[in-house]
Amino acid sequence: MLSLRPPFVLLALALLSPTSHSAEPSGRKVRDVVIYANPLFHSAFPSVVQRPDGELLVAFRRAPNRLALSEGHNNHVDPNSYIMGVRSRDGGVTWTPTPELIYAHPFGGSQDPGLLQLRDGTLLCTSYGWTFVRPDGVPKLKAPVLENYPGSIFNGGYYLRSTDGGKQWSAPLYPPHIDAEILLTPYGKPIPAYNRGALTEGKDGRIFWVVAACDSIQPSKISTHLLISSDHGLSWQYSCPVAGDAKVSFNETSVYETPRGDIIAFLRSEKYEDQACMARSIDGGKSFQPWQGMGFQGHPLHALRLPDNRVLLTYGYRHKPLGIRARILNAECTDFATAPEIVLRDDGGTSDLGYPWSVVLDAHHVLVTYYFNVPGGLQHVAGTILEIR
């Protein structure tokens, strides 16, 4: 998280494509779809939910395509990046042609929206942001701050709530600062907790959110921690550390509750050869067992419960051949080391792709959303419909 193409209308064409390249019998690729593409914008980092009436809502981060302005490249940090949304009423095949604005932060630079739909229909949308400071101001900021690109200062996390299906959103709500975090905002205040990744609502109604914290700037080191809400996301309490290490950093974590009640954090790693990692709690989130590598590369991960309680684990693959991959795990996620890999996409153009987020469509189909680019193309929001066997 901290390391961090075609007319102007939505391209929502359903492209029939071959079945998965893997021999895995449990999942078969049906088709790829374009969810949102526009040559004026770099569109990325989607999340998706299905509303009670079957409507799909995808939130994503959109920023101006700097290449169209004759600049040398696009960044993942931009003063004009906003949270946008599109909707589908036909199972993800076609999407609303004009995206709706979910939120534009007053200080700019909104990132990676993470949607969670609660059982009562309430929507949460997490994000984090960057504030852009002119060169004469940066040296005068109270330290320590995190500067990504020149002048872009990390501002921490926030989230939005909606009780009407995303038609209207609350003003930003700010999670608590956690003690492990050393960074300050550009205004000299403690950083609010932040993360890019899926939250989950547990069987008892509590919401689990694994957030990141910068423990050290030199050398850079990031750990993860669990926050819990018992009031539908109105407030949060710190629970415990999730994963930390003297050399390896962890961030961009999605959290999942198994039928048995284990809480599993699926972790992106840094300085660990891009290996997917996980940590497990067997006491309801009071503590976590030591983190472990999962034996394969890819990031970040998203876990989705299937109708039969198996788990679809999806992840971006930024190694050749570039694309999107998945595994179907057992209900308790104990067979990650042996579950066959499913290749959803292997036609990526550059490594600026991935970040999948999935949703169940019906008893036998799933939509996997992600951002993608093909050779010579611009980043756009896409998806793959997968048949589950």
List where the protein language model places each region.
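N-terminal secretory signal peptides that target proteins for export/translocation
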Residues: 1-3
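Bacterial N-terminal signal peptides
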Residues: 7-17
